[in-house]
Amino acid sequence: MAVRLRRVKRANPYDLYRTCATGDCPQDVKDRFEHNTIADKILKWGSAGVFLGGLGIGSTQARPGLGTYSPLGRGGVTGRIPVRGPGSTRPLGRPFSSGPIDTIGAGVRTSVETSVTVPDVVAVLPESPAVITPDSMPVDPGVGGLDISAEIIEEPSLTFVEPHGPEDVAVLDVNPAEHDRSVYLSSSTTHHNPSFQGQVTVYTDIGETSETENLLISGSNIGSSRGEEIQMQLFSGPKTSTPETDAVTKVRGRANWFSKRYYTQTSVRDPTFIQEPQTYFYGFENPAYEPDPFEDSFDVQLASPSEPVQPELRDITHVSAARTFRGESGRVGISRLGQKSSIQTRSGVTVGGRVHFRYSLSTIEDAIEDAGEIELQVTNGSQGPSGSLQHTAETILSEGHDAYVDVDMDSVGSLYSDIDLIDEHSETPHGILVFHDEAETDVVPVIDVSYVRKPLSTIPGSDLWPTNINIQNGPVDVDLQDSILPGIIITDSGVDGTYFLNTYLHPSLHKRKKRRFS
């Protein structure tokens, strides 16, 4: 059994290079750490022939060399320029003297021996009082009836207090050093770009008209007219609802159905071929290959194929979907691609050309521009009083839009007389009272007691129809005040004859309840 050798990993290159003191370091590790590999040699040889100094390649700093651009200053940049203050007496030479500078140690308090002198405060009284009282007041005739009184304010008393405290108080006179560099003057400069910022001029003088920018608000008739009246002309209208702005690129090759190199161009006169091309496809049946040739169908005769109207439509086997097109003349039409089967070999291969069938739609002439007017045909063939209106309409259309004719409506007669339009009046009226409420609506029929219709049948002994009255054909007068009571009683709650929704049945019509004796 073969023993599989185990691959032993080599130590880290950093550890191997550290142990190379004896000279047994691998060559690849040595070249890597001493930068003596093939890549390092190529860089050394290339740098000897090509000088790339100053471009900052291989370093983190890059500076523009000769021939490069310098960045322009942007607008609104604030620069700090140190200048001397107004009270500075610093010489123009070195800021410090050439002598040694004394150092002050930390924690040492500076003391200056000075003598404190307290000034004497002397009270000086004012020579003139604060309030002046005149001897006499001038009389103003415009101010009458007013009492003017002068108020005298006493002078306040001033008390001066002598300062008390120790006399050995140190007073330090601290002056700014001559070499103080904390005094700066900040100046800013803003550059305006006239391409993006317009010049704004504010005029404070009101009514000044000597400037160049004058605003004159006036009508159309003030001043000289420098314009020119140009009459607008209408261009030709678009041929489609959404006109294409880009030019239509011409299609080449087999995608161009109008190419005579790939397709035979045929104009179709029958629109049926474009709408239903399957009517031009027909075939023959061979009885020898039918599954049941001896059925009872000998008397049925197969319809002979219809002969195409055009000879170019023969031998068509396949047609494509219809597509609209626009030819070079600008006319719109519908076209299809067809495949003919003129020759068929024994192996079943059909040979035939491809034909482009196109059907051009009729051109719609602009009757308004060519003829100037459109003649309206009479669609109503009735000969009656409406003939005068038709004649008037034709007269208006023939004379133009500016001619109008006043038509007297009373002059037009009616096909029916007023007597025929009057409805028949019924002598047996039956009114209906409708009581409407927000919640419900009740309809109560009201029968006129002066007219009674003849009933279908008379019930002897009934309260609805009396038996002792001789009812003849037609309406008769019946007195129902004593003999018949109405089934529904409507109470009259108003003086003016207004009926309310207060109805109830007559007590005689209520069903009698049987009493139960316990």
From Swiss-Prot:
GO terms for biological process: microtubule-dependent intracellular transport of viral material towards nucleus; symbiont entry into host cell; viral penetration into host nucleus. Keywords: Capsid protein, Cytoplasmic inwards viral transport, Disulfide bond, DNA-binding, Host endosome, Host Golgi apparatus, Host nucleus, Host-virus interaction, Late protein, Microtubular inwards viral transport, Phosphoprotein, Viral penetration into host nucleus, Virion, Virus entry into host cell. Disulfide bonds join 20-25. Highly phosphorylated. GO terms for cellular component: host cell; host cell endosome; host cell Golgi apparatus; host cell nucleus; viral capsid. Transmembrane segments: none annotated. It comes from the Viruses. It is found in: Virion; Host nucleus; Host early endosome; Host Golgi apparatus. Belongs to the papillomaviridae L2 protein family. Minor protein of the capsid that localizes along the inner surface of the virion, within the central cavities beneath the L1 pentamers. Plays a role in capsid stabilization through interaction with the major capsid protein L1. Once the virion enters the host cell, L2 escorts the genomic DNA into the nucleus by promoting escape from the endosomal compartments and traffic through the host Golgi network. Interacts with major capsid protein L1. Interacts with E2; this interaction inhibits E2 transcriptional activity but not the DNA replication function E2. Interacts with host GADD45GIP1. Interacts with host HSPA8; this interaction is required for L2 nuclear translocation. Interacts with host importins KPNB2 and KPNB3. Forms a complex with importin alpha2-beta1 heterodimers via interaction with the importin alpha2 adapter. Interacts with host DYNLT1; this interaction is essential for virus intracellular transport during entry. This is Minor capsid protein L2. It comes from Bovine papillomavirus type 5. The lineage of its organism: Viruses, Monodnaviria, Shotokuvirae, Cossaviricota, Papovaviricetes.
